[in-house]
Amino acid sequence: MASWGLLVAGASFTAFRGLHWGLQLLPTPKSVRDRWMWRNIFVSLIHSLLSGVGALVGLWQFPQMVTDPINDHPPWARVLVAVSVGYFAADGVDMLWNQTLAQAWDLLCHHLAVVSCLSTAVVSGHYVGFSMVSLLLELNSICLHLRKLLLLSHKAPSLAFRVSSWASLATLVLFRLLPLGWMSLWLSRQHYQLSLALVLLCVAGLVTVGSISISTGIRILTKDILQSQPYPFILMHKETKTREPVARNTSTLSLKGSRYLYSTAAAALGGHLMVLASPKRCMTPSVLGLQERRLEPGKVAHADNASTWE
């Protein structure tokens, strides 16, 4: 049975890695800039739908997996846990292949803890019910992944994004914090039925997943709910494609002496160039015209505005 469970996990790993590769051949939304991240989150959404809904239906139909999370479970529940092991391993490889360790260390720690705990149930055939309860967390991940896809598609200031943010917070409490609390309570009461190594492994997994879950909830609450304008768009410069502020050409010409006349320029333009002279500053009509074109209706130009976002 152990080899059979590992075979299912290996097949799941291959399938999800193939899905990562296959999505590269399909187009992504035009508004998405980080295409790899969008594909990665999309694959994660597929797994969350499969495992989260499967765990909810399984626990609803077989509540004995909650009353006896060590031994009592239907055979297909072990298959679902093995599929999740393959997914988390495939997702970890995908992150290592496309990101640096500094960028993905937190999720890699999460995946390592989850794979270690779930693979114990797959290999031993025990604690499958406990693992099924942990897969309820994927119901919250569905909302988190949808929110992330909207964010990557630059749909943050929208009704759909705000609904996904509220849904993420609600499901985080219902399907993430409550299951984690139940698992912690069960482990504290039934730890004598487990070996010391397994207890330490479960504690490490609960602490890792719990801390990441709490930090995620705080981040969504502060950025999406409490802020009036979450994730404002920063339009990029059309040519440089960077997020650096583009300086406006509002500089003036300082005159140190008395009045200066641009006789040479006036003669070249046939005497049609109006010269603005000042003891301190002088600005040509072309610069003034550039300012007027960039100003929005109803706003007043200030000479002190040196830069803006374009």
UniProtKB/Swiss-Prot annotation:
What keywords appear on the UniProt entry? Answer: Cell membrane, Membrane, Transmembrane, Transmembrane helix
Coiled-coil intervals: none
Q: Which parts of the sequence belong to the TLC domain?
A: 33-227
In which organism is this protein found? Answer: Mus musculus
Q: Name the family the entry cites.
A: Belongs to the TLCD family.
Q: What does this protein do?
A: Regulates the composition and fluidity of the plasma membrane. Inhibits the incorporation of membrane-fluidizing phospholipids containing omega-3 long-chain polyunsaturated fatty acids (LCPUFA) and thereby promotes membrane rigidity. Does not appear to have any effect on LCPUFA synthesis.
Q: How does it sit in the membrane?
A: Multi-pass membrane protein
- Where found in the cell? Cell membrane
Task: Mention one GO biological process in which this protein takes part, according to its record.
Answer: regulation of membrane lipid distribution
GO cellular component terms, A-Z: plasma membrane
* Name of the featured protein: TLC domain-containing protein 2
Instruction: List the PANTHER family.
Output: CT120 PROTEIN (PTHR13439), TLC DOMAIN-CONTAINING PROTEIN 2 (PTHR13439:SF2)
Q: Which superkingdom heads the taxonomic lineage of this protein's source? A: Eukaryota
Q: Which InterPro entries match?
A: TLC-dom, TLCD
Transmembrane feature ranges: 6-26, 40-60, 79-99, 117-137, 167-187, 194-214
